[in-house]
Amino acid sequence: MRTTILRQSLAALVAAALSLGVLTQAQADTLRIGYQKYGTLVLLKAKGSLEKKLAEQGVQVQWTEFPGGPQLLEGLNVGSIDFGVTGETPPVFAQAAGADLLYVASEPPAPTSEALLVPKDSPIKSVADLKGKKVALNKGSNVHYLLVRALEEAGLKYTDIQTVFLPPADARAAFERGAVDAWVIWDPYQAAAEQQLQARTLRNGTGIVDNNQFYLATKPYAQQHPKVIQTLVEEVRAVGEWSKANPDEVTKQ
């Protein structure tokens, strides 16, 4: 996993902090991070390296797991967390609703890490076969956009299917018991369904969506504590490089 620091954002952040004089202020006591069941933040949490680095600045780390990007963005918006990672779609809705966010880093596109799945014995063979069927998804997430694009590619309208909005765990349960006909989801839920349930992939994001991931901070927190954010992003990048060099160790996390 290769993390790209959005240098213009960080440069603007530091410049703003200098102009406001906040770099001389006391550091935050706690950095509250929102994460999901995938990606570099999971590895960072497991390794514990961030806690050691920030302890030198007198800052503790608090981790909160979220079921999906929209829920994490709500946490950022209401101020229950200071930093998190999500796909490209949820921040669009959050910022449209007035969320004051700063993009500080990104991961490379991963179009195969989300997919539209059906049960292994389903008679559904293509996206076009979904007409009139029930599809489970996490509303407002990256997979919501994948579903729209996949339907469009197959010549279907969004209104041609029945959407069932469920968080990942509930969607998996509905998928297993046959309460829905298809499920559009991301890794690691996607991989688990493929391996444990032998779910079939109708369409992943290749060629129709990028599935980008962005690291975001609330702008007020980032402006008041730029050194904390810089340290965090540096640790994210370091863990990303470590994961590339140690794939066997990553599977043990």
Segment roles from a protein language model:
Residues 22-28:
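Sec/Tat signal peptide C-region and signal peptidase I cleavage site
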Residues 29-157, 162-165, 181-185, 202, ...:
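Short, glycine-/small- and polar/acidic-enriched structural segments
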Residues 14, 148-152, 191:
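A broadly conserved amphipathic alpha-helix scaffold signal in soluble, globular proteins
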Residues 1-13:
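Bacterial N-terminal signal peptides that target proteins for export
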